[in-house]
């Protein structure tokens, strides 16, 4: 391809700065006031005042928080003890609960829940497998003659 201009190094031989003004203006970070965030409390304060939030100086200063990765965070799907007592009849008809030593065994993870809360009234003796249960829920199920067994959050 044809070159339509001459290189500056070629036609500026002997000029010392090759079109960059005074000596040192085309060197590293000296002409721009330093590298990166240098000087925002000194000679670049006008940039903070112009582009930063008033009062806080964000995004130049201060803590900026932390966004937890979605792979770590758990989406809780709770169910109350009272609602579980209502569901037991339906679950029994569908065959999603089994009987063990005169008590019904319910796995909340298989039902789509991962937390047991203590709202409502429980009168059915149940053995409940769940990753998380509140203190009130454990007490109500124990009072009805059942028990809560804590399992891993990973689906079995």
Curated annotation (Swiss-Prot):
Keyword presence, Transport: no
A biological process term (GO) from this entry: translation
Biological source species: Pyrobaculum calidifontis (strain DSM 21063 / JCM 11548 / VA1)
Transmembrane residue ranges: none
Summary of subunit composition and partner proteins: Part of the 50S ribosomal subunit.
Pfam families referenced in this protein's UniProt entry, alphabetically: Ribosomal_L27A (PF00828)
Domain of life of the source: Archaea
Annotated stretches, region: Disordered: 1-35
Name this polypeptide is given: Large ribosomal subunit protein uL15
Family matches, as Gene3D superfamilies: 3.100.10.10, 4.10.990.10
SUPFAM superfamilies attached to this UniProt entry: Ribosomal proteins L15p and L18e
Biological role stated in the UniProt entry: Binds to the 23S rRNA.
A GO CC term assigned to this protein in UniProt: cytosolic large ribosomal subunit
MF GO annotations: rRNA binding; structural constituent of ribosome
UniProtKB keywords: Ribonucleoprotein, Ribosomal protein, RNA-binding, rRNA-binding
Family: Belongs to the universal ribosomal protein uL15 family.
Basic residues bias (residue ranges): 1-16
């Amino acid at each position: 391809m044809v070159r339509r201009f001459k290189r500056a190094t070629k036609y500026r031989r002997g000029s010392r700065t090759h079109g960059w003004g005074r000596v040192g203006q085309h060197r590293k970070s000296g002409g721009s006031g330093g590298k990166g965030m240098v000087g925002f409390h000194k000679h670049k304060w006008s940039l903070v005042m112009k582009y930063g939030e008033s009062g806080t100086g964000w995004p130049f200063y201060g803590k900026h928080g932390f966004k937890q990765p979605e792979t770590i965070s758990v989406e809780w799907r709770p169910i109350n003890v009272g609602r579980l007592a209502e569901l037991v009849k339906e679950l029994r008809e569908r065959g999603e609960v089994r009987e063990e030593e005169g008590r019904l065994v319910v796995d909340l993870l298989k039902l789509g829940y991962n937390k047991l809360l203590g709202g409502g009234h429980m009168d059915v003796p149940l053995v409940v497998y769940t990753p998380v249960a509140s203190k009130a829920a454990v007490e109500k199920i124990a009072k009805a003659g059942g028990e809560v067994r804590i399992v891993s959050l990973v689906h079995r």
